[in-house]
Amino acid sequence: MMAAKIKKGDKVVVLAGRDKGRTGEVLQVLPKEERALVRGVNVVKRHQRQTAQSEGGIISKEAPIHLSNIAVADPKDGKPTRVGFEVLDDGRKVRVAKRSGERIDG
């Protein structure tokens, strides 16, 4: 299995689709479907049936967006960047923004 370039909690920029240019935080990554849920992006309206716990009606929720349509935001300037990996002296593997060379985690 390949190392994940996009993880939960990352700030990402949408590259394509109706939300192009919007930024948001990754809420969940779905590796099998190659998709991710991003807060405030790709919001769809769903008809919800009324249950004992929740009220019915039309609710807005995020739909998963394909990983090819999002890119990690560079920690330096917030612009989209590709992600590389770097092995530190202590053996840890960290993600690095290819655009600025800045570390994304670690």
Curated annotation (Swiss-Prot):
One GO CC term on file: ribonucleoprotein complex
CDD domains attached to this UniProt entry: KOW_RPL26
Keywords for the protein's UniProt record, in alphabetical order: Ribonucleoprotein, Ribosomal protein, RNA-binding, rRNA-binding
UniProt KW rRNA-binding keyword: yes
InterPro entries registered for this protein in UniProt: KOW (IPR005824), Rib_uL2_dom2 (IPR014722), Ribosomal_uL24 (IPR003256), Ribosomal_uL24_CS (IPR005825), Ribosomal_uL24_KOW (IPR041988), Translation_prot_SH3-like_sf (IPR008991)
Gene Ontology MF terms: rRNA binding; structural constituent of ribosome
One Pfam family linked to the record: ribosomal_L24
Listed GO biological process terms: translation
The organism's place on the tree of life at top rank: Bacteria
Cited HAMAP family: Ribosomal_uL24_B
Purpose of the protein: One of two assembly initiator proteins, it binds directly to the 5'-end of the 23S rRNA, where it nucleates assembly of the 50S subunit. One of the proteins that surrounds the polypeptide exit tunnel on the outside of the subunit.
Protein family: Belongs to the universal ribosomal protein uL24 family.
Subunit record text: Part of the 50S ribosomal subunit.
UniProt protein name: Large ribosomal subunit protein uL24
Source organism (scientific name): Azorhizobium caulinodans (strain ATCC 43989 / DSM 5975 / JCM 20966 / LMG 6465 / NBRC 14845 / NCIMB 13405 / ORS 571)
Biological classification of the source: Bacteria, Pseudomonadati, Pseudomonadota, Alphaproteobacteria, Hyphomicrobiales
